[in-house]
């Protein structure tokens, strides 16, 4: 069985910064500056807004309105759906808005697009540099853990684990992000509704990422624990269920081999119990992948394996298997 399909991103990190803007009264500005801001607002498309913003900054670099203009333009970039185009806009943005706090403003959007473009190593490196300066940035901590887990999966080689530093740093970022999400530590100034949605959608994915990292660190027991937590929060996610099925299959196979070598009744009982657990996870995985074109081949493999195990435990019959799978279908 394939260990892990590419981890699916449940929600983009984009448009975080607009949730952190100050809502205070705007400072008084000159008529010329007001017109420059209106030109940015009226500009059609992000490219034109960036041009107008560059003109604005040239003449108003010290203005108290600069942070708001930067936040507005950053938000417009975050709404762009084409990741390669968005990365180009981010590069353009940082040429105009070159203050450290302005770079921080656009950083989650850049990392989000790198992840969305499967440039996991670049995303991981960008995020790692950022959290050296801002260690409590839960958005970027989450991104680093997610990018690290995907990079670990992409770099897997037979008998050769991913780089230890990658696993260590991704694990640390994931652990801190989980701690903050579990404790409901909403960042100061972040919109409560945005935080709630972010927390609910990303907590199971962070547990999944931790499971992937532990899996490739050769800690299958720890990986299973994290993946079970992820499944408890989101019981319909195919990658989580596929990895759990893979881990359970390995556990069952090892018990079966031990029984064949030692022929002890206790080992047989343990192996059969493990098979029943595996059947349950395979049924969940079958339910989650059925009808999904991305997992068509995997679903067939799962069903073949599931039918064999189920029949073995039910006197060669598969009566009731459809009902078992149906039980785990998403409502």
Q: Where are each of the predicted segments found?
A:
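Short coil/linker segments at helix-helix boundaries
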Residues: 47, 79-80, 84, 88, ...
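Residue at a conserved register position within TPR or TPR-like alpha-solenoid repeats
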Residues: 43, 73, 77-80, 114, ...
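The tetratricopeptide repeat
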Residues: 35, 68-72, 105-106, 140, ...
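Structural register within alpha-helical repeat arrays
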Residues: 36-39, 72-76, 110, 144, ...
